[in-house]
Each structure stands twice: as C-alpha cells, then as structure tokens.
Amino acid sequence: MALVQTHGSRGLHPEASDPGRQPSRRRSRQSSPGAVPEPARARRRRAPATTASGSRAAPTARRASSPPLLTMEAKPLPPAKKKRGTVVTPQGHGTLQAIDVATNGAVEIKYHLDLPRALEKLLQVNRAPPLPTDLTPQRLRTLDSSGLRALVLALRPVRAEVWTCLPRGLVSMTTIEAEEGQADHHDVVQHQMQAPRLHFPLKFLVKGTQVQLVQHVHPVQRCEHCGRLYKHKHECSARRRHFYFHHINSHSSNWWQEIQFFPIGSHPRTERLFLTYDVETYTWMGSFGKQLVPFMLVMKLSGDDRLVELALDLALQLKWDRWHGDPRTFYCVTPEKMAVGQQFRQYRDRLQTALAVDLWTSFLRANPHLADWALEQHGLSDPDELTYEELKKLPHVKGRPRFVELYIVGHNINGFDEIVLAAQVINNRAEVPQPFRITRNFMPRAGKILFNDVTFALPNPAYKKRTDFQLWEQGGCDDIDFKHQFLKVMVRDTFALTHTSLRKAAQAYALPVEKGCCAYKAVNQFYMLGSYRADQDGFPLEEYWKDREEFLLNRELWKQKGQLKYDIIQETLDYCALDVLVTAELVAKLQDSYAHFIRDSVGLPHAHFNIFQRPTISSNSHAIFRQIVYRAEKPSRANLGAGLLAPSHELYDYVRATIRGGRCYPTYIGILDEPLYVYDICGMYASALTHPMPWGTPLSPYERALAVREWQASLDDLGTCISYFDPDLLPGIFTIDADPPDELMLDPLPPFCSRKGGRLCWTNEPLRGEVATSVDLITLHNRGWQVRIVPDELTTVFPEWKCVAREYVQLNIAAKERADKEKNQTMRSIAKLLSNALYGSFATKLDNKKIVFSDQMDEGLLKGISAGTVNIKSSSFLETDNLSAEVMPAFEREYLPQHVALLDSDPEDSEDEQRPAPFYTPPAGTPGHVAYTYKPITFLDVDEGDMCLHTLEKVDPLVDNDRYPSHVASFVLAWTRAFVSEWSGFLYDEDRGVPLEDRPIKSVYGDTDSLFVTQRGHELMETRGKKRIKKNGGKLVFDPNQPDLTWLVECETVCAHCGADAYAPESVFLAPKLYALKSLLCPACGQTSKGNVRAKGHAAEALNYELMVNCYLADAQGADRERFSTSRMSLKRTLASAQPGAHPFTVTETTLTRTLRPWKDRTLAALDAHRLAPYSRSRPNPRNEEVCWIEMP
C-alpha cells in the first residue's frame, strides 16, 4: 500500500481512483453574490477559525469585554458601524482543465494554492523529513519556473512531473529525474547529507511564472460540440455550441469571415485631376515578333481648375505640342521606338511629383513646429529628410487633411496602351519628398492590367475610430475615416466601365461622335515601309479600308475640308485627338451620371459617389450591393455583420464546388429543316438574385445534424414534391449521392451537371460525392431522383432565408423603367450594366498568387519567403531596350588602344544581334600623347527592382476570403437550374415513359439562358408555359409574400418588319457556340428577315450559312476538312510570364487560324446520326474513371 497525495491532508490513504468533483462542498466555499441571511452570518462569525492567521479572534474578544462606564460629563460614543458581508474560508485548492498536447486528451489538474504549506503537510503525511532549512516559506512563495529544477534537486523525489500551461487551453508535461547518475557528484553528496530521497513522486504546475504543487491529474471527457470538459455529464447551450464552433475550434473558426465594409462614397473635398489619353501604334519587326510600337500620343487635361492649371504649366514646360482644336489637349508624334513612352513617363513622373510636393507644402504650412521637432529629435535641418516612420511620431499634428486623386484614363488602355507603354511609364520612384509612405497596387489579370495604383500618404490628424455609423449607412465619409491624407495616382479604363467600343459607348451615353475614321493600315505601312499606296491626291486606296462604303465616306469627308494634299499623319492626329475628346466627355458623363444614379435611384444623397474610385463595373456593382445591405441591416461596425459572411479556407473550395458553368450544348448535330424558335430568359441572373438566399451564421454541428435529418426525411418521401419555400427546411450546402429514375422518365435537360469525368457534363448518370445546394436537392427530388445526404464535416446549414439582393435588383429595374419612359439612354445603360454585373462579383475566383515588383515586397512578404510560407513561382525582367539609358560622364572608363584592339577580335564568339558598344573620341584637351578610346559604362535610369517582376504564391493552398459571399453565387446558379427544370417540365412531361429515341424533337440547343425549340416546343410554350412568357404578363422580381419561382422568357426570333414571333425554316448546328440560322420567316406577315451566325473564336465576317453547311456535309462524307478554316489578327499580350519566348509588357501581333469542323469531343451520347442525349446508365460517360465505394443492400 503506497501513501500518496489525496483530496485531504489529515490522514493516510491507499492509492485509489479519484472520487471526482463534489459540487455541494465546492459551492459552500464560493462567495455569494447576494446578501446572506443574518442567522447564517452570525453562525459563521461564531465558528472558530483554526486556520486563520489570528485576526478572526478579535471580534470574539471585543464581545467578551464589558462596555465602558458612562458618566454625565463624557460624550456618548457613536454607535459602532455594523459590518456586513460573508466570512469565507480561503480556498486551499485550484482546478485547471486543459488539453494535454502529448495525448490530445482532456485532463483536470487539481493543485494547492499555498506551495509551502502543501509541501510541509505532504512531507508530514508521508512521514518524510522536513524541508531543508534553506527552503523557507518566503522563498517557496516567490519561487518561479526558473528555480523549479533546483527545488526538485533539493527534495530529490523518485520522479518529478512538471505540467506547463500553454496558450489556447493547452498543457504539456515534462519530467525531471533526480537519479545519482544524472546529477552532479558534489550536488548528490550534498543532498544526501541534507535530506534523504523522497520515496514518492511530485507533480508541479507552472502557470506563467508561478509554481504550484499538484494534488492529482485525472482524465476528463470533452464535449465535441461546445468544447466543455466534464467528468460524467454536462449541459451545453445552443449559444455556447455556436460560439465554440465559429470562434474557438481551431479547425472551423476560420471557415467563415466577416465581410469588411467602407462607405461607397468618397471624401466630399477630394481634389481630382483627369489625364485622358490615347496612343496610336505601328508594327515593328523585332526579336520577339511583330511588336506594336507607339508613334503618337494625345492627352487631354480636365478636373479641378487649380490642378489643371498646374498640369498645363508642366506640359508647356516640357515642350509638349498643343493641339489646335483644344487648348487643354497636347500631343507627341515621333517614330522613334522609345521616345513616346519616355516622354509620357517623364510627364507623369513630374506631374505626380508636383502634386506630391503641393500636398507636402500644405502639410508643412499647417505644422510649423515640424522643422524644430525634426532638428531636435532627429538632428535633421530639412524636414524633407524625415522618413514616414519618423514623421508619424510627430506630436500635435495639425491641419485640415487633403485628398488628391490623379486619374490616368483611356478607352481599352488596360488591354493595350498601358501594356505598350508599361516599360516606360510604370514607375513609382519619382522624386517625391521622403516623408511620404508609398504603396502600390499592381494586379495584372487575364492579359490586362486590372490595377496600377500608387498612393503617397501622410498622417491624417483628424483620424480616429468611428463610433457613430449613421453617416456610413448613408454612404458618406469624412475626415475621421481616413488614416492618411494622400495623393493617389490611378489608371482607369472606360472600357471596363462600359464593356463596349468607344463609338458604341458614346452612342449609349448620348455623346456626339464625329463621322469617319482613319486608314490605320495605311499608317502602319507608311511607318513600316516609308510609303503606302494612294491616289493622285495622296488618299489611301480602297484596300486599306474596311469596305467600299467606308472608303467613299471618308474620301468625301476629306474633300469637304478643301485640302490639296492628303496628310496621313495630320489626319491620324486629328482622329486620335477627336477620340481623346470623346473619351474625356465620356469620363465626365460617367462620373456625373453614376453620381446622379446613386443619389436619386439608390437614395444616397450624402454618398459623393465617384465611379472611377473602383476600376470595373463589377467592383462598383458589388460596392453598391454592400452599401444597400449595410443601410438595411445597420450593423454599426466596420463590416456587414454576422448575417452575410464570406466562406474561407476549407469552406471556400467547398462552396466553389457548387459554382458550375451554364448549360451550353446541342442535342442535334447537322442540318435541321423544320421551324426553329429561340426563347431567352429575361434577365436570368437578375431574377435569380431576387429569390431567397442563405442568411446568418451557419449552424453548429449539433443543430446542423438535426437540420440534415429533417432534410433526409423529406427526401426519402419520393412520392411527394417538396416546395422550394418550405419553412421547415433550412438552406444549406451538402455532399450528396443521387440516383436517377428509370430511363423512360428522363429527358434531354438534366437537372444537374458533374465534372467527375474531367469535363463539365449535364448528365443523367448516378451522382456520387457531388456538392450541391439545398435548392438543387429539391430540384433533383422533384424530378424523381433519389437523393442521399452524405455525412461531411464541411456540410453547411444556414439558420434562415432572406432576399438579400432583392432591393438592389428592384432599384435597377425601376431605374431602367423610368429611363425608358423619359427616353434617357444614359440611365438605361447604367441600370442594365449594374443589374447584370452583380452576379459576376459574387462568383469572383480568388487565388493565393500575387505579382509584385521586386522593390515592392513589403516586410510581411519577405518574412513569408524566408519562413517558407510564400514561394517565388517565377521572375520576369522587362526588356532593357525599352528602358531609357544615358551615359554618365563621371563613370567613363579609359581604355588603352591595345586593350580596344582585343575587344571582339574573334568573330565566331559574337552573335549577329550583339553589336559592340559605341566608342567615343576623347574630349579636347586630353593630356598625354597616347590616343585613347572611351567606352562608356551605360546606366539605365531604373533600378533592378523596377525591372524584375515576381509571381508569389502562398504555400498553403487554402484561400483567405473576407470580400465575397461566394455562396450567394452558388444559390443564384441553383435558382437558374430550378428555372430550366420547370421549363423542361413544360416540354417533356408528356413524354415520360417513352424511350428517348422514339420521342419527337422539341429542343435542339441550349445556351445558358436560352433554348432553341421546334414547332412542337413552341406550341407547348404557348400553352403549358404560357404564364412564363413575358408578353402575357408576369413578374420578374420575387415576391416574399407570395413565394413562387419567378422567371419569364421571350421569343428572340422576331420579325424585323412587324415584330411578331418568327422562326428559322432551316438551321445547322456544328458544335457548342457554333451554329447558324439561315433566315427568319414571319408566319404573321410572311416577310423574311436576316438569319444569325454564331461562331465563337472565329472571324465572324468570314462565315456564312452556306459555308457552315458545306463544312458539315464535307465532314459527313469524309472529305478534306482543312479548307474550312478562318483567320483573324490577334494581339498577344504579355504582362508577367515565365515562358522563355514571352517577354513582360509586350504586345505582339499574330495571325490566329481556327479550323471549322463539327463537334468531335462530345459530352453527350449519340442516339443516331444527328440526335444526342445526355449520358445515363445505359449510355455511360467514357471519361469517368473515378472509383467510389458503394454498399449494396
């Protein structure tokens, strides 16, 4: 029988299992928060206090003494103040519950709070010698973790366990052995003389720096739902489970993140300067192919008058030529390869430097004590030499903050002009004052420069944390919301805000457009060859124009000018300048129109909205959506609250798995000689956005399991259709298995698609391990599929539905209808663009890649690279011949003639393109009689950091997302699949039970939101689908008070004469997005209209109906297919690439040739020579090789 430490300290007990916690006795030792009845207090005061330090005996002594004698002369003593409270015995033990990192199990540690007394009693109980004399109580009470080993060596137990508290509720256990062989010989002899070995183990707890003696350590259980540790049983609330799952659990706490928010508006005092420009290029045959080189640049200045005057003075100072048609328009014309880019770069650098100096001057004027502070604190006589880190420590910063924005604007410049000029103009090393904090946002994407913004920031004295968010709810902001006052230099592309050509954009926004155009082919040939083919007046021949009509129009316009000779360069300059003027007017129109839309249509009069603050229409639409949600929910914080979250890390990929492409495939290949109608869903994504979306923080696993059980019970009832708006079924995203009904019940429009075979296929095969939304579950169930929810820890269930985007869509539809009544083409274009762009912002795909210039890697990126959490995937260097270079005389090096004679002496060692560096004769007055030749050391006016682009990627593949609620895109697509499923019912319900090959053809092609139906399909739409045809009336916006699927279609094939529904009498289908309708015939008036040719990726002007028919017939008969092809000129844009043949920031011209042929790699099974059907059990997908585990009953 061993004597060990137990709960008590007054006896010897054998080693036994711990009886566990005793709640009743523990509660008696706790202090009560409320008042205690008087009898109870009296009993506790009369109880003897044997363990007290002596102070508790004083009241008893006072009660035993007799009261003093009162005399007539003595003043009466004031009544004694009655003490209130509860006298409690100090606790002798503490309890700690934590997770052992070694076993990952939960333990409960009970420890003594008084280390000296606990050690003393323990030694007495076990009849061990007392503590050494040097281990005084005072020394033990002040003992920290650094002296614990010395204590163990002094006590010399058999074994010493040290339990150390770690962050996040963890503990680790280590041991200290005190055997003679492991200790120093002198210490061993000394300890043997002072105290014999203890024959029982000791356990210590280290909390911070404190050391306590452990009484016992027992394993306990841990609740997987709420994280509570317990011995036998416990109760956990829904609130605790929710909090633990989303904030404490290390595995799931980062699955959903709050979406950050800032008001949509800009600061009301923002000063803006717009530099609108356009570039003309010619083709130069270089070492990288046909490279486009700029020879002309025209720019126009607009904005705040003071800033415009500053920019005008700078343009005149740098000797820019002023265009005759406008005093604020300047140009540069030169065929030299780098001259245009260098001149534009010089102007942009000098302009941003002048604006930065102007901002810095106003800061110095507002803080006159800065100069004395810089001299006193940093020993700097000039404040310009301060760094930003030093400047932000300036006390008592004063002044009214300024916010200056410089916009470099053009039409389609991010995909062309900015790339051509990038090697010269991308620079942030302008000579701005040193105290500025310079940051850069550079993001190339899909061959375009999406962001190229540079910010020069100074401290804002008015900045503070906002507590009242009423202004934010109205879309406004003021001085306190900005941490810095700044100068921002931003590149913006009007094409990204209009999605159309400049001429069409001008028409859409009611801007005047000059007639005519320029023969750019002739200009290109003139710069390449020095001449071009022209008539006697110098006017380019017809071969340089698009067609004869364009040739005649432009020649007539030129003759009206009365010029004797055609000046091709001057004409090009005038047309380029006119394009710049139209673009500048478009900039002003966009800025004013969108501000008017936000103020009046959205109802945010205090927003001060600036459309150019964000680069794309998608980013602007998402900002408007967030602002509307913020105004409605009023979260009073800097995020959208817990209602709308963003999936992140593991959940991001899980949610993205539900975002599947649109339906686009033909079910008929060949020539169809029966009537064909085309129906299109009206605003499909907009209508889907008005439907209910998931809302709220996802449920914890326990509540989620209950919701999943409810779902499975409904899915198992195969004979009953489930309502999409059943209040008992919560929205969610699930992993499912699904089996289709009998093949006689299937149709050519499957309700779901799969990527399991490597290609996206709309299939009627069994589904295994697919991720689907709850809307898809209902769609599959109602179509007769048997759906089983597969247990998955990533399964997500939301607490409620909410029409989160309905108000946004309603605002745009109302604005569009009002614009139609007022015939306001501008407002109509804005409302239509914003309505269509929102879905795309939800579906934005994020990754862990980032492209930065070498000099732009901040401290966080450098630490990530050194720690191995960030990898450099590739590095690219700009072309050095695109960078300006100069010879610096101070670094010229002298070469002796004999040294020069040895240079490049062996012709076999040199390449054709490598020419020796130029040699210069020595300057006059060079001493010495020996003839020297000077070879300069050439210096580029760019640092190596400016020349090197790094593509960085995080090692962790999980995406951190706090911007986009991607699950909204998942449900938008799910609602569109529900639309098409209902549409399928109109067409194919009457065919159930008939084999597919025996059914009449009702539809032959589907493309996302459209369906090509035959005459029978048209009749069914006019009867069974009558309520979904727009001309018959109907709603486009979901009504929560009368929940029902809300979508409408309209016939796209309409007569050009009377507007009635028309049909194509003959058509040909070759492949997805490759078809042609011969013509349109109107049954009402009998007129014939022009047909339609759709050929994605091909030159549309080279295709016609007859060519596509011949292509199909040649393929069907086994003839040569190579003659059926189209060619078009293509621009290859390279921004940052690791490919050896692609150089950064180059645009090369190539000829793209595509072969025209019928669909070969089909994603459907063939029924006959023409008809196709989705894959099914009898016609499996040959690409599927995935093995899955199926348990047969």
From Swiss-Prot:
Record-level Gene Ontology MF annotations: 3'-5' exonuclease activity; DNA binding; DNA-directed DNA polymerase activity; nucleotide binding
Principal cellular location given in the protein's record: host cell
Location of region: Disordered: 1-88
Source organism, top-level taxon: Viruses
Miscellaneous comment: This DNA polymerase requires a protein as a primer.
Annotated function: Eukaryotic-type DNA polymerase involved in viral genomic replication. DNA synthesis is protein primed, and acts in a strand displacement replication. Assembles in complex with viral pTP, DBP, host NFIA and host POU2F1/OCT1 on viral origin of replication. The polymerase covalently transfers dCMP onto pTP, thereby initiating complementary strand synthesis.
Protein name: DNA polymerase
Upper lineage: Viruses, Varidnaviria, Bamfordvirae, Preplasmiviricota, Tectiliviricetes
Designated gene of the protein: POL
